[in-house]
UniProtKB/Swiss-Prot annotation:
It comes from Pseudomonas putida (strain W619). Belongs to the RuvB family. Residues 4-184 are annotated as: Large ATPase domain (RuvB-L). It is found in: Cytoplasm. Residues 258-348 are annotated as: Head domain (RuvB-H). DNA binds at R294, R313, R318. CDD domains: AAA. InterPro entries: AAA+_ATPase, AAA_lid_4, DNA_helicase_Holl-junc_RuvB, P-loop_NTPase, RuvB-like_N, RuvB_C, WH-like_DNA-bd_sf, WH_DNA-bd_sf. NCBIfam families: PRK00080.1 (NF000868), ruvB (TIGR00635). This is Holliday junction branch migration complex subunit RuvB.
Amino acid sequence: MIEADRLIAASGRDREEVQDRAIRPLRLDEYIGQPVVREQMALFIQAARGRNESLDHTLIFGPPGLGKTTLANIIAQEMGVSVKSTSGPILERPGDLAAMLTNLEPHDVLFIDEIHRLSPVVEEVLYPAMEDFQLDIMIGEGPAARSIKLDLPPFTLVGATTRAGMLTNPLRDRFGIVQRLEFYSDKDLATIVSRSANILGLVIEDQGAYEIARRARGTPRIANRLLRRVRDYAEVRGKGQITKAVADLALNLLDVDERGFDHSDRRLLLTMIEKFDGGPVGVDNLAAAISEERHTIEDVLEPYLIQQGYIMRTPRGRVVTRHAYLHFGLNVPGRLGEGADFSEAGDE
């Protein structure tokens, strides 16, 4: 199974990137949710503009689909400068990074997505650029090689990552501002869905927006994707209006249940319950039982189920919690009662 194949995948798709540009907020006052991040960034941006300086280098991290790219573009808009965008895997050689840095205007924003995937040799070039606004370039080869320094205009590097722990300490320490994006509340997601529907010219009721929001796994990207699919259903079977009933019918047809689980999520949970008595079960045994790769379970299926409290990792393997039994209307085993002891829970 490929993550991008799932309707509820948090990772982006090329076609969606184009579609999302039309509904992406451009200013902080249009940015919904993340109140602490929004207030802090408004303060930092106002201060930097008041001093006529570049904003400090900013690291944005959090799960995929929460708006890291959107926030980077908003920073550039609020600073009144241009943004140049790239990603860690694309910058294969120092020359690739040097070409982008030398084309920046004063105070511009350089946005690097998946910054944790920068190669070490490229990262070394980035250090003096971030710290001293200088670029060290080697001219020539062998004994005749020499290093020259090029001055760069002051700029703001905005790095985005889903895996902040994979950043090297020297790179992490060079960011003056670090922001973590959290999963969104259903209320904020419903506001995002209503806003997107309005931009797309759709008729949507508040309850219809909330029905989509509560199945979107706390992620705006998923909420907007579900909105587009519910729109298709509404146009064909619902007279073009998205009500709670229409959203419910559409999402049930799309196999996204009231908790935002799809077939793959439910199959994993039911396999653990029915074949392994709720666990503990090792991830390799679980992978064999559902015919999936180990990394698919660890990287694609498990994170949301763990975050929602349906699965726990213990020293002896994975176990389902009482919430999984309740979700399927099954009797909760006595060992998983209200006073169940998970004191030994941890990473397998």
